[in-house]
Amino acid sequence: MAVGKNKRLSKGKKGIKKKVVDPFSRKDWYDIKAPSIFEVRNVGKTLANRSQGLKNANDSLKGRIIEVSLADLNKDEEQSFRKIKLRIDEIQGKNCLTNFHGMDFTSDKLRSLVRKWQTLVEAHVDVKTTDGYLLRLFAIGFTKRRPSQVRKTTYAQSSQVREIRKKMFEIMTREATNCDLKELVQKFVPEAIGREIEKAARSIYPLQNVYVRKAKILKSPKFDMSKLLELHGDSTDETGTRIAKDFKEPEILESV
């Protein structure tokens, strides 16, 4: 007798469908909070599976990168070409506390800057802030016509490009190493570093459209909860409740 499965017995009833489980029923929504340096604090929402067994929901949320337009963060449509990256560092209840992770330009903005008859000057440098963040900053600039210039082209010589690039290195290093990450991010929005480069390069060759087009965090210091809360405006100096100086312990009663 052949040993094997009985095909007649193994067949189940036809028409029985498996119970469909909605995957969203096992997930929770979390609010993403931006640092206090931005005008809008509620960035959006994100999903995560509920904590189950050894799997913690917080572990799946920490380290997530969120990309937001600066126009949405500061309610300024003129800054829509800047993209800000935020990293989730801590979870408090249903709130995800984020920190700055990077900045970049949109591709359409970069393409609109590149034109004919001018020289493109680029530079990048690694800098370290006072609070221990190692960043790589990318600067970009374009030559423009001198006052009362008749010639259509504004090409700079290679020696002039090297001099301008050297100025870019010096200014980006100086501006970044003398402040912490929070102050550096605040310099990106009004383009304070770009204006400094434009002013310094005026004696070499006049520039236009000078920007720090990209900032990338290469290395972060050890995570500090108090600094993150300070960045979100939730920290307090008082760690406990104060007790009155003239406090006296009650006397021990002999009988109750």
UniProtKB/Swiss-Prot annotation:
For this protein, the record's Pfam families field holds: Ribosomal_S3Ae (PF01015)
Is-annotated flag, keyword Acetylation?
yes
Q: Which SMART domains match?
A: Ribosomal_S3Ae
Q: Which UniProt keywords apply?
A: Acetylation, Cytoplasm, Ribonucleoprotein, Ribosomal protein
Question: Mind listing the GO molecular function terms for this protein?
Answer: structural constituent of ribosome
Fetch the InterPro entries from UniProt: Ribosomal_eS1, Ribosomal_eS1_CS, Ribosomal_eS1_euk
Any GO BP:
translation
What positions are modified (N-acetylalanine)? A2
Grouped into one coarse class, the protein's main location is cytoplasm
Q: Which domain of life is it from?
A: Eukaryota
Q: What Gene Ontology terms describe where this protein resides (cellular component)?
A: cytosolic small ribosomal subunit
The record's subcellular locations are: Cytoplasm
Which family is this protein grouped under? Belongs to the eukaryotic ribosomal protein eS1 family.
Oligomer and partners: Component of the small ribosomal subunit. Mature ribosomes consist of a small (40S) and a large (60S) subunit. The 40S subunit contains about 33 different proteins and 1 molecule of RNA (18S). The 60S subunit contains about 49 different proteins and 3 molecules of RNA (25S, 5.8S and 5S).
Instruction: Tell me the protein's name.
Output: Small ribosomal subunit protein eS1
